[in-house]
Design a protein with these regions (language model features):
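SAM-dependent methyltransferases
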Residues: 1-163
């Protein structure tokens, strides 16, 4: 202490608000079995994001396949992260086949695309997106992270086929 003040002052809320936000360049792709718990999806997402040194605010969107539009665990994850949730058609995810690290016959039979988590993350990031964390899985869910070359916003997602 010098002059009665601690050497390391806590960052005030005002100073936190003045810090620039990190660019929203990460797309978090999620696939899951019907009815997968929000707890399981969140735990998998947290572990996957930790692999890329996740910082609050860097997730631009939680993305998946249209078949999962009403999946409570995916919707809860997006709300928890403060990120929008967007969905792609199976046809749009099928277009990402060549960029997938793994193709699943079981997923293809169920959805019409070869991979949901990786495909959705890559689709959200556009043709110059990079897969940072390939598909990770828990018992009933999958998760992947891709990075776009520029911030991802609603306009970019709509152009890339998200709904």
């Amino acid at each position: 202490m010098s002059g009665g003040l601690p050497e390391k002052m806590p960052i005030s809320a005002q100073r936190l608000r003045q810090r620039p936000l990190p660019p929203r360049v990460l797309a978090l792709g999620i696939g899951c079995e019907r009815g997968c718990s929000a707890v399981e999806i969140a735990a998998l997402a947290d572990a996957t994001l930790a692999e890329v040194g996740f910082e609050i605010g860097t997730v631009a969107a939680v993305v998946s396949i249209e078949l999962k539009r009403a999946e409570p665990g995916i919707l809860a994850l997006a709300a928890r992260l403060g990120a929008p949730v967007w969905f792609f058609t199976a046809a749009r995810l099928l277009a990402e086949t060549e960029r997938l690290s793994h193709r699943s016959t079981a997923v293809f039979r169920a959805t019409g695309c070869w991979g949901v988590a990786e495909g959705a993350a890559l689709a959200a990031c556009g043709s110059d997106g990079v897969l940072l964390v390939p598909k990770r899985r828990s018992r009933r869910a999958t998760c992947a992270v891709a990075r776009a070359s520029a911030p991802i916003d609603a306009t970019a997602l709509a152009v890339r086929g998200a709904r």
